[in-house]
Design a protein with these regions (language model features):
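Glycine-rich anion/phosphate-binding loops
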Residues: 26-43, 70-73, 116-118, 176-183
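Conserved anion-binding
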Residues: 20-22, 59-60, 118-209
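N-terminal small/glycine-rich loop or linker at the start of catalytic domains
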Residues: 4-30, 62, 79-80, 137-171, ...
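Glycine-rich, proline-tolerant flexible connector loops at the mouths of alpha/beta enzymes
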Residues: 24-26, 50-77, 205-212
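N-terminal amphipathic alpha-helix/helix-capping segment at the start of soluble metabolic enzymes
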Residues: 1-21, 191-195, 248, 303-316
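Conserved, mostly hydrophobic/aromatic
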Residues: 18, 44, 48, 93, ...
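Alpha-helix-loop-beta-strand connector modules within alpha/beta enzyme cores
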Residues: 64-101, 129-139, 181, 219-234, ...
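C-terminal helical cap(s) of enzyme catalytic domains, especially alpha/beta-barrels
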Residues: 127-128, 285-312
């Protein structure tokens, strides 16, 4: 398997979202057959996706638990079909260890765990055994389940991770501190299971049980993840707080209209530009071409010292 050395020197990588679910908030039901999913995978790769993130269970507000075997039946045939014809990096979006094991054996490279190894006590061991890379997400829904922004989400994890006393203390923490309280627990689990540090990426959990203000504050905190020595895996594409911001600014956001749908992706791409200007390693997105352009601008800012001193007369 791989380690995070594939991140070095490549700039920000684009991770294309491929949901093989009937109920995901953006593309649910579109790619539930292997043929449809494979066709979309080819399209994403052709457009420039360097990673494909394949999910078999929706995590949107109001979604429902998917049984382990059903989730395996959704993702594994798609992973096998993609792997037959491409060496693209494949991430499986799951918090269940049995799904992760089946996906890794089918050819996946990365486990994208929205519970940060805390939802399934066997997950970290599976990742270590397969020498896979992992994305550990800060999950505010698990960290403060009684918060109004959390109660609209499904329950993540097989059993409670934090005691009621811990949850009471965590409920008082500023969101930036809460993120690190959660990550400290996740990273301790990873270390205990033997997952190598250089195989771990951290995801600040944008859009999961957070207020608009908290989402924005966490985006301001991206640098602290780098300061701790971890690469960042960021997912902001089509998140509700993004839509809310541009809606309040007077822009059309109704996804049933062509303009509204476009504006959602355009606004998301602006955040990709900001993120890449801060050196974020991976962005998880729906629209690859739009985010590819945005990332090229952000990356140019991040690598300003390496830019050529092209004068005005030399511009094309």
């Amino acid at each position: 398997m791989i380690d995070n050395k594939w991140l070095s020197g490549q700039g920000t990588l684009l991770c294309g979202i491929l949901n093989v679910t009937p109920d995901s908030f953006s593309d649910g039901g579109k790619y539930t057959s292997v043929d449809a999913a494979l066709q979309q995978a080819r399209k994403l790769i052709q457009e420039g996706a360097q990673i494909l993130d394949i999910g078999g269970e929706s995590t949107r507000p109001g979604s429902h638990y998917v049984e382990i075997q059903e989730e395996i039946d959704r993702v594994v045939p798609v992973i096998k079909a993609i792997r037959k014809e491409s060496d693209v990096l494949i991430s499986v979006d799951t918090w269940k260890s049995q799904v992760a094991a089946a996906a890794l054996e089918a050819g996946a490279d990365i486990v994208n765990d929205i519970t940060g190894f805390l939802g399934d006590p066997k997950m970290a061991a599976v990742v270590a055994e397969h020498e896979a890379s992992a994305v550990l997400m800060f999950n505010p829904v698990m960290a403060r389940p009684h918060h109004p922004s959390s109660t609209i989400f499904p329950r993540f994890g097989f059993e409670p991770v934090f005691s009621e006393q811990e949850l009471q203390q965590m409920a008082q923490e500023p969101i930036q501190d809460l993120m690190w309280t959660f990550f400290d627990r996740s990273l301790a689990v990873a270390k205990a299971a033997g997952v190598q540090t250089d195989r771990i990426m951290l995801d600040p959990g944008i859009g999961f049980g957070l207020t608009k203000r908290e989402n924005l504050l966490l985006l301001q905190e991206l640098g602290t993840i780098h300061q701790k020595g971890y690469p960042i895996f960021l997912g902001v594409s089509r998140k509700r707080f993004v839509v809310n911001i541009i809606e309040e600014a007077g822009f059309e956001t109704d996804p049933a209209t062509e303009t509204g749908f476009w504006n959602r992706d355009l606004a998301s791409s602006h955040l990709t530009s900001i993120a890449t200007s801060q050196g974020v390693e991976v962005v998880r997105v729906h629209d690859i071409p739009l985010h590819k352009m945005a990332a090229s601008l952000g990356q140019a800012i991040f690598q300003a010292q390496e830019a050529a001193d092209t004068n005005l007369k030399q511009y094309k």
